[in-house]
């Protein structure tokens, strides 16, 4: 069991409420507690963290609409699966939204399908027999993220490591490993920003001139981060 560490966690308890604050996805920060009113943290999340988002207003609105409808049906499943594999449920749900917009029947031309858009080999490796079963898919995706977190040895901070895990989820661990080895003689010293720059430059015979597979992975990581922030920001309105 492992935990995908929060880049920064600040908890302010007021009766039964706990507000989770995370600074930015690619920075590791102090773990020291800070005693500040909840409203201040909510203001920071809303005005500062979301300022890094590349999502359009339409995309944010669409996310909120589906968060109020589709997500509510599966929220407890995300929470329980995340607890089982020591993940943040917001991160797990953010991956699912990027993959399928929380649509358990989603399919793609590349034969991945389901809530977490698992490939057939990946599904088999985590014991998923029906990829269109939302509960199986959520738990399978959580287990796969957990396994990747144990395998990934890259990144100089917890935020970096999370980005590498997400890249591996999207691109495949072997492809990430090969890319890292092309960057630096010491893979453990490679940062996410270095891998990001490298991936953007990668091209394959299947890539278009304007959009490479590597760029797709970079976009995947960034969008998961954005959705993760949006889910965290909802704590301020609970």
Task: Set out the residue ranges of the language-model regions.
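Bacterial N-terminal signal peptides that target proteins for export
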Residues: 4-17
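Bacterial N-terminal signal peptides
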Residues: 17-26
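N-terminal export signals and maturation junctions of secreted/periplasmic proteins
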Residues: 26-79, 105
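Catalytic and substrate-binding regions of cell-wall glycan-acting enzymes that process beta-1,4-linked
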Residues: 47-52, 163-230
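Second-shell loop/turn segments in exported
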Residues: 61-68, 78-81, 104-106, 124-135, ...
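Short, functionally critical alpha-helical segments immediately adjacent to catalytic or ligand/cofactor-binding
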Residues: 79, 87-103, 138-142, 165-171, ...
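Secretory-pathway/luminal and periplasmic proteins that interact with or process carbohydrate-rich
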Residues: 100-109, 148-154, 171-183
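Substrate-binding/active-site groove segments that recognize
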Residues: 105-129, 136-147, 196-199, 224
